[in-house]
Amino acid sequence: MSAEKQTHGFQAEVSRLLHLMIHSLYSNREIFLRELISNASDACDKLRFEALDNPALLEQGGEPQITLRVDKDAGTLTIADNGIGMSENEVVDNLGTIARSGTEKFLANLSGDQKKDAQLIGQFGVGFYSAFIVAETVTVETRKAGEAVNNGVRWESDGKGEFTVETVPRDEQGTAVILHLRDDAKDFLDDFKIRQVIGQYSDHVAFPIVLETPQEGDKDTKTETLNSATALWQRPRSEVTDEEYQSFYKHISHDFQDALTWSHNKVEGKLEYTSLLYVPAQAPFDLYQREANRGLKLYVQRVFIMDDAEQFLPQYLRFIKGVIDAPDLPLNVSRELLQDYGPVQKIRSALTKRVLQMLKKLSNDDKQYAKFWAQFGSVIKEGVAEDRDNQQSIAALLRFATSKTPDSVSTSLDQYLESKPADQDCIYYLLADTPSAARQSPHLEVFRKKGIEVLLLSDPVDEWMVGYLESYKEVKLVNAARGELDLGDESEQANNDDPLIQRLAASLTEQVEAVRATTRLVDSPACLVLAEDQLGPQMRRMLEAAGQPVPENKPVLEVNLDHTLLQALTRIEEDEKFNDFAALLLDQAMLAEGQLPKDPAATARRMQALLSQSV
C-alpha cells in the first residue's frame, strides 16, 4: 500500500516559468524529448559513477539504458531510465523548485516576445519542466539506486501550481517520466515521429535509447534501439557532421541555439586526453554570478565523473561548454585533487591555448566575431589581468570603438598598429563613462586635428583592464587624458606663465590639483586631466561598489588660452564675478567628461545669474 499522499505548492518562480514556457516554446515543442532524455542520460552517468565505489548498484539495475514506451490507448509516452533514481526529498527539491540564483532577475527579463523569450528560456535551461509543453499531466515514478523496493516515490502534477508526492513500492531502480499527452500532442505517440526527434536531437547519447511498442494481437512488445550510443567525442572528427556536433552541444548545454564554433581535439603521448569545446552564441544569464555552476563535463575512460569541472579552464573562459575525457586520471578523482593535480594543470594550460586559438580563428569572420564580442567581450577583458602567460594572445582578441570608427566596436590592436603613422610610438586610448561621452570628449580634439586614432573605452572594466596591459607588441598604451601630453611641437607652446593661469589656480585651489595651459584642445575652452598617480572614474566606482576606501581625487584643469571664453576672462576685474566664471568653467569641463559638478545647486545658481545678465 502507498503511504499518504502529500500536496505541495510549486515555488513561485516555477509556476511563472511553466506558464511562460508553455506559451513561448510551443512552436519548438519537440525539445521536451531531448531535455527528458538528457536528464535520463545524466542519471545513468551518475549511476555508473556511484558504482565505482559500489558495483552492486549496477548489478541490481543491469546495464544503464533509456527506454521509451508508447501507449496509444492511454495516450501516454514514458521516458524511463535505470539510472541513479531519486529519494523523496530529492523529488520535492528537484521537481518543485529552481535552485538557481538569479532566477527572479531572469524571469523579469522576459519580454512577452515569443521568439526572444524562447531563446532566453532555452539559454536558462528548462530541463524536466519542458514536459508540460506537451503533457496535461505528468507522473514521475522513481526509486533511488540501493534503496528498498518499498521506498519508491510517485510525483504527479498538472503544472498549474501544485504537485502531489507519495511513497509507493517500485521494483525497478531509476526514474520513469509518464506524460499524459495533450490532444494536440498525440503525434508523439507515432513511432516515426519519435525516431525523427531522436535522430535529430539525441543520436549521440552514450546510452542505448530503446523504443518499446506493443504489437497488435500479440502480447510481445517490439523493441528497437534508436541511437548509435557511442561517445561522440571519441569518434574521429572526419566522421562527425556539423549537425551532430551542434546536436551534441544542445544536449550538454540545454541551449536552443547553435554554438558559434567548436574545437574537437585528441592528444596522445605522455598525457592523453580528448576535448570537445564549444563557444555559445549567447551569454548565460548568470555569467557574472560567482556562485553559478560552470566548467566542463569530466569523463575518465568514458565514465562520467562530474559536471562543472571548473579546474580545466580559467575563470575568464567560464562561458565555454564541452567535454574533457582524460583516461590517465584516477577514476576516484575529486574536485580537491583536481585543483592541485599536476596533469590537470598541464591539460588546463593546453585547453586555454586551444580556446584562444579557436577564438582567434573565429575573429577572421567579422560578422560571427561581432556576435561573440557583444556577448562575451567584457569577460575576455578579465583575462588580460588574470592570465599574464597568455596576455598578448588575449589582447589580440580585444575589440574597440575608436575616434575614427566611434559607432562600431570592431577595431583590434593589430588593426590599430597597422594604420597608425610610422612615427607614432604609442597606442592612445581614452576612458569615459559612456560611449557618447567618449565620442564627444574634448580630449579628442587635438588627435582629430593631427589625424591620430584613439581607442574609446567605456566599458566599466576597461580602466582596470588597461592597468594591466602596459603594452602590445612592445608598443606602449597611453591614456590620452592622463598627465601632460606630448604630440610634438605644439606641446612646447603651452604658456603656463600667463597671468590668467595663476588667477584661475588661486580661484579654484580647493577644487583642482593644478591649472595649466593646454595643447589638447582646439574648440573647447577647458578639460579635466588626471595626474599620473590618480584613479580614473571607472576604477573609483568599481572600488566604491566593492566597499573599498577610495582616496579623494583633485583633477588638473587644462585651459585653452586661445579660446574666446578664456580671453574674455582676462578682461574681468571683479573677483566675485571672476570666481563665478572660473567655477562654471570647471563645471562645464566636468559635464563634458560625463561627470556631475560637485555642487549642482551652486552650478544652477551661477547659470541663472549668468542668464539673467544676458537677457
From Swiss-Prot:
Region annotation (C) ranges: 542-615
Family matches, as Pfam families: HATPase_c_3 (PF13589), HSP90 (PF00183)
GO MF annotation list: ATP binding; ATP hydrolysis activity; ATP-dependent protein folding chaperone; unfolded protein binding
Transmembrane segments: none
UniProt keyword annotation of Phosphoprotein present: no
GO cellular component: cytoplasm
Chain residue ranges for the region called A: 1-335
Described function: Molecular chaperone. Has ATPase activity.
Protein name stated in the entry: Chaperone protein HtpG
Gene responsible for this protein: htpG
